[in-house]
Amino acid sequence: VSRHSDTDIRIIPPRVKGGLVLFGAHDWGALLQQAKKNNISRARVCTHMDNRSAVQEMLIAFMKDSYVRPHRHLGKSESFCVIEGELSVIFFDENGKETDRVALSASDSKKPFYFRGERENWHTVLIESEYAFIHETTTGPYEYDDRLLAPWA
Protein backbone atom coordinates (compact mmCIF):
# COMPACT_ATOMS: atom_id res chain seq x y z
CA VAL A 1 0.00 0.00 0.00
CA SER A 2 1.36 3.42 -0.92
CA ARG A 3 -0.03 6.94 -0.80
CA HIS A 4 -1.53 8.54 -3.92
CA SER A 5 -1.95 11.86 -2.15
CA ASP A 6 -2.00 13.02 1.43
CA THR A 7 -5.60 11.87 1.83
CA ASP A 8 -6.16 8.68 -0.19
CA ILE A 9 -4.83 5.19 0.17
CA ARG A 10 -3.61 3.60 -3.04
CA ILE A 11 -3.90 -0.13 -3.40
CA ILE A 12 -1.91 -1.63 -6.27
CA PRO A 13 -4.13 -3.97 -8.33
CA PRO A 14 -2.98 -7.27 -9.77
CA ARG A 15 -1.43 -6.94 -13.23
CA VAL A 16 -1.45 -9.76 -15.73
CA LYS A 17 0.50 -10.56 -18.89
CA GLY A 18 0.46 -7.93 -21.58
CA GLY A 19 0.04 -5.02 -19.17
CA LEU A 20 -3.66 -5.69 -18.57
CA VAL A 21 -5.23 -4.55 -15.31
CA LEU A 22 -8.18 -6.63 -14.14
CA PHE A 23 -10.57 -5.63 -11.38
CA GLY A 24 -13.54 -7.76 -10.35
CA ALA A 25 -16.13 -8.33 -7.64
CA HIS A 26 -13.57 -9.72 -5.17
CA ASP A 27 -11.33 -6.66 -5.67
CA TRP A 28 -14.32 -4.34 -5.32
CA GLY A 29 -15.27 -6.00 -2.03
CA ALA A 30 -11.72 -5.59 -0.71
CA LEU A 31 -11.63 -1.93 -1.80
CA LEU A 32 -14.97 -1.25 -0.11
CA GLN A 33 -13.70 -2.85 3.11
CA GLN A 34 -10.59 -0.65 2.93
CA ALA A 35 -12.79 2.45 2.52
CA LYS A 36 -14.85 1.42 5.55
CA LYS A 37 -11.69 1.10 7.68
CA ASN A 38 -9.97 4.22 6.36
CA ASN A 39 -10.37 7.34 8.51
CA ILE A 40 -11.31 9.36 5.40
CA SER A 41 -13.93 6.79 4.33
CA ARG A 42 -12.56 6.18 0.85
CA ALA A 43 -9.94 4.12 -0.94
CA ARG A 44 -8.67 3.96 -4.51
CA VAL A 45 -6.93 1.69 -6.94
CA CYS A 46 -4.79 3.50 -9.50
CA THR A 47 -4.80 1.52 -12.73
CA HIS A 48 -2.24 3.66 -14.56
CA MET A 49 1.38 2.57 -14.45
CA ASP A 50 2.74 5.57 -12.54
CA ASN A 51 2.27 9.29 -11.88
CA ARG A 52 3.91 10.16 -15.22
CA SER A 53 1.20 8.39 -17.28
CA ALA A 54 -0.62 10.69 -19.72
CA VAL A 55 -3.96 9.23 -18.64
CA GLN A 56 -4.62 8.72 -14.93
CA GLU A 57 -7.38 6.19 -14.18
CA MET A 58 -8.63 5.24 -10.75
CA LEU A 59 -11.32 3.05 -9.24
CA ILE A 60 -12.53 4.73 -6.05
CA ALA A 61 -14.81 3.50 -3.27
CA PHE A 62 -16.46 6.24 -1.19
CA MET A 63 -18.49 5.75 1.96
CA LYS A 64 -21.40 8.15 2.55
CA ASP A 65 -19.48 10.10 5.21
CA SER A 66 -16.41 10.69 3.02
CA TYR A 67 -15.49 14.38 2.85
CA VAL A 68 -13.83 15.57 -0.34
CA ARG A 69 -12.56 19.09 0.27
CA PRO A 70 -13.61 21.44 -2.54
CA HIS A 71 -10.78 21.80 -5.02
CA ARG A 72 -9.97 22.49 -8.64
CA HIS A 73 -7.51 21.08 -11.13
CA LEU A 74 -5.23 23.36 -13.12
CA GLY A 75 -5.20 22.58 -16.84
CA LYS A 76 -6.79 19.15 -16.40
CA SER A 77 -9.96 17.45 -17.51
CA GLU A 78 -11.73 15.02 -15.19
CA SER A 79 -14.47 12.46 -15.66
CA PHE A 80 -16.45 10.12 -13.40
CA CYS A 81 -18.40 7.04 -14.37
CA VAL A 82 -20.55 5.80 -11.49
CA ILE A 83 -20.39 2.01 -11.30
CA GLU A 84 -22.47 1.64 -8.16
CA GLY A 85 -24.35 4.09 -5.94
CA GLU A 86 -25.26 7.76 -6.26
CA LEU A 87 -23.34 10.99 -5.84
CA SER A 88 -23.51 14.66 -6.67
CA VAL A 89 -20.75 16.80 -8.12
CA ILE A 90 -21.16 20.27 -6.60
CA PHE A 91 -19.61 23.40 -8.14
CA PHE A 92 -18.76 26.64 -6.35
CA ASP A 93 -17.78 30.20 -7.20
CA GLU A 94 -14.61 31.87 -5.91
CA ASN A 95 -16.32 32.70 -2.58
CA GLY A 96 -17.61 29.18 -1.91
CA LYS A 97 -21.22 29.77 -2.99
CA GLU A 98 -22.77 26.76 -4.73
CA THR A 99 -23.35 27.49 -8.44
CA ASP A 100 -24.35 24.10 -9.84
CA ARG A 101 -25.01 20.52 -8.79
CA VAL A 102 -24.97 17.44 -11.03
CA ALA A 103 -26.60 14.28 -9.62
CA LEU A 104 -25.14 11.01 -10.92
CA SER A 105 -26.49 7.50 -10.42
CA ALA A 106 -25.58 4.00 -11.53
CA SER A 107 -29.17 2.78 -11.19
CA ASP A 108 -31.60 5.70 -11.65
CA SER A 109 -32.32 5.93 -15.38
CA LYS A 110 -33.48 9.55 -14.94
CA LYS A 111 -29.99 10.62 -13.88
CA PRO A 112 -26.77 10.45 -15.87
CA PHE A 113 -24.12 7.99 -14.71
CA TYR A 114 -21.24 9.84 -16.41
CA PHE A 115 -19.75 13.29 -15.98
CA ARG A 116 -16.85 14.99 -17.75
CA GLY A 117 -15.59 18.50 -17.09
CA GLU A 118 -12.78 20.62 -18.45
CA ARG A 119 -13.55 23.72 -16.43
CA GLU A 120 -11.21 24.72 -13.63
CA ASN A 121 -14.19 25.30 -11.34
CA TRP A 122 -14.13 24.63 -7.63
CA HIS A 123 -15.94 21.37 -7.00
CA THR A 124 -16.51 18.54 -4.56
CA VAL A 125 -18.23 15.17 -4.51
CA LEU A 126 -21.11 14.41 -2.13
CA ILE A 127 -22.01 10.73 -1.71
CA GLU A 128 -25.81 10.34 -1.72
CA SER A 129 -26.02 6.56 -1.14
CA GLU A 130 -24.54 4.33 1.58
CA TYR A 131 -21.45 4.06 -0.63
CA ALA A 132 -20.46 4.80 -4.20
CA PHE A 133 -17.97 3.20 -6.55
CA ILE A 134 -16.62 5.24 -9.47
CA HIS A 135 -14.12 5.08 -12.29
CA GLU A 136 -12.32 8.43 -12.46
CA THR A 137 -10.15 9.54 -15.36
CA THR A 138 -8.02 12.65 -15.52
CA THR A 139 -5.19 13.86 -17.68
CA GLY A 140 -1.65 13.24 -16.50
CA PRO A 141 0.95 13.42 -15.46
CA TYR A 142 -0.09 13.59 -11.81
CA GLU A 143 1.47 16.53 -10.02
CA TYR A 144 0.38 17.19 -6.45
CA ASP A 145 0.36 20.97 -7.05
CA ASP A 146 -2.10 20.66 -9.97
CA ARG A 147 -4.91 20.35 -7.42
CA LEU A 148 -5.73 23.50 -5.49
CA LEU A 149 -7.71 23.15 -2.27
CA ALA A 150 -10.38 25.80 -1.68
CA PRO A 151 -9.20 28.26 0.98
CA TRP A 152 -12.78 28.74 2.21
CA ALA A 153 -13.41 25.03 2.84
Residue ranges of model-derived segments:
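Conserved hydrophobic/aromatic beta-strand scaffold that supports enzyme active sites
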Residues: 59-61, 79, 114-116, 136
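A short, N-terminal "cap"/entry segment at the start of jelly-roll beta-barrel domains
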Residues: 1-55, 100-107
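Conserved short histidine dyad/triad with adjacent acidic residue
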Residues: 59-76, 119
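Glycine- and acidic-residue-biased ligand/ion/polar-headgroup-sensing regions
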Residues: 64, 75-95
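Cyclic nucleotide-binding regulatory domains
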Residues: 87-115
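Short beta-strand His + acidic residue motifs that chelate non-heme Fe in jelly-roll/DSBH
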Residues: 69-71, 89-91, 115-117, 123-128, ...
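Double-stranded beta-helix
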Residues: 99-103, 108-110, 122-153
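Short strand-connecting beta-turns/loops that link adjacent beta-strands
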Residues: 52-53, 75, 130
